Amino acid sequence: MLNHFNFKLKRDVTIIVPGEAFVSNKRVISTILGSCVAVVLCDESSNLIGMNHYVLVKSDLDISPAQRGRYGIYAIPMLINAMLENGANKSNLKAKLFGGTNFMAKGSVKVGLENSEFAINTLNKYRIPILAKDFDQSKSRKIFAFPESFKVIVEYPDGTKVF
């Protein structure tokens, strides 16, 4: 995790890397994604947002507690719990999902697709509404999530979108 002042945004930003998550009601949260997925949760009543960044759905190996955030099977429940521990109300949670790029779409293993489908299915299981998804493109992206508006800015190599 890296905290810095982003001169373009004129804001304090916390950058998370694979396996990390962060919850805030003040700081913008950012990460860079390819086939990994970031789940961004919001409780608008408390201006609270949280973001995780997971690499794979699961692992067949034994995983140390420090590595669990790298796998969606742990990362999504951990993010939900972190939101609740920081004052969110589960019935107010909403989600936006990003990443899931399939750089090698012709290969038999489509990590991005598996990651994105897992996020959708898991949030449906928790009955958390998904307000936006940005998957299925063959390009990387950098995302910025804002706590006061739940706006997420996505920067691609060739442009920007707002979700």
Swiss-Prot record:
Coiled coil: none
Biological process terms in GO annotation: chemotaxis
Catalytic reaction list: L-glutaminyl-[protein] + H2O = L-glutamyl-[protein] + NH4(+)
One Pfam family cited in the UniProt record for this chain: CheD
Record GO terms (molecular function): protein-glutamine glutaminase activity
Keyword annotations from UniProtKB, A to Z: Chemotaxis, Hydrolase
Entry-linked SUPFAM superfamilies: CNF1/YfiH-like putative cysteine hydrolases (SSF64438)
EC number: 3.5.1.44
Function: Probably deamidates glutamine residues to glutamate on methyl-accepting chemotaxis receptors (MCPs), playing an important role in chemotaxis.
Annotated NCBIfam families: PRK13494.1
Stated family: Belongs to the CheD family.
Record's protein name: Probable chemoreceptor glutamine deamidase CheD
Source organism: Borreliella afzelii (strain PKo) (Borrelia afzelii)
